[in-house]
């Protein structure tokens, strides 16, 4: 099935067949990363520009490696290195870069909706690498790829998403993607960190971690942003950890083959204990590995437009 979209802006707008197509392609491309020479000429002569206006380690590095393994030329621009520090708007930056004839922009921005706005004003393809609290589609795709590798299916799985869901673009993309693929999604966290629109998203909500652990095939732990305590959304990090931190003791109630996931970066000892993060149920590093394959698939599909 050909991928007809110019851009990849979010999972909410993709259908099941498009998601399946991306995941199948990612699986086929993953073996390139195990070769002694990890490079194919697929995107030779193509140019990918990374525009990151928010800190990133895994996503930016992963996209850069993915592009280079497909033989694309890559260039990275951050806020500090861009003309935005001189007052230039993002749209003007993109229009000037577009005049240099790139093929793909990979864009991360603090403001929700920014990739959509930029995509309307450029002929190059745009990949959303995370926009505000809105979406992070490539993260959700690599999460689903990891679940498929270990569980062999998504349809019928019960996936619990634990933590600061209200402010999480990772959670939103996973909700849209997993629900479309037939998974049951349970959100768990304090009432102050559950989005008010949760009841409209086709998910279940629980405020008691002990109730959802025995039911889950996958537990996805989200990073607790420490500024939430300063915003008075939490009494303290210690209290959050007591009630919602995932520990080996709490995991004793879990299914024997439960998967533990985390998009990173981790706050060890807050939302997840070190023995769980590094334990036998953890597939956190598998997520990182699969991130390269998923981003290769996205660049493959959009870079050849």
UniProtKB/Swiss-Prot annotation:
One GO biological process term: 'de novo' UMP biosynthetic process
Lineage: Bacteria, Pseudomonadati, Thermodesulfobacteriota, Syntrophobacteria, Syntrophobacterales
Transferase found in the keyword field: yes
Gene Ontology CC entries for this record: cytosol
Domain of life, source organism: Bacteria
Name by which UniProt lists this protein: Aspartate carbamoyltransferase catalytic subunit
Pathway(s) served: Pyrimidine metabolism; UMP biosynthesis via de novo pathway; (S)-dihydroorotate from bicarbonate: step 2/3
Catalytic activity reported: carbamoyl phosphate + L-aspartate = N-carbamoyl-L-aspartate + phosphate + H(+)
Keyword Transferase: yes
Task performed by this protein: Catalyzes the condensation of carbamoyl phosphate and aspartate to form carbamoyl aspartate and inorganic phosphate, the committed step in the de novo pyrimidine nucleotide biosynthesis pathway.
Binding, carbamoyl phosphate: 58-59, 108, 136, 139, 264-265
Pfam families noted in UniProt: OTCace, OTCace_N
Sequence similarity: Belongs to the aspartate/ornithine carbamoyltransferase superfamily. ATCase family.
Binding partners and assembly: Heterododecamer (2C3:3R2) of six catalytic PyrB chains organized as two trimers (C3), and six regulatory PyrI chains organized as three dimers (R2).
Organism of this sequence: Syntrophobacter fumaroxidans (strain DSM 10017 / MPOB)
Gene Ontology MF terms: amino acid binding; aspartate carbamoyltransferase activity
Binding site for L-aspartate: 86, 169, 223
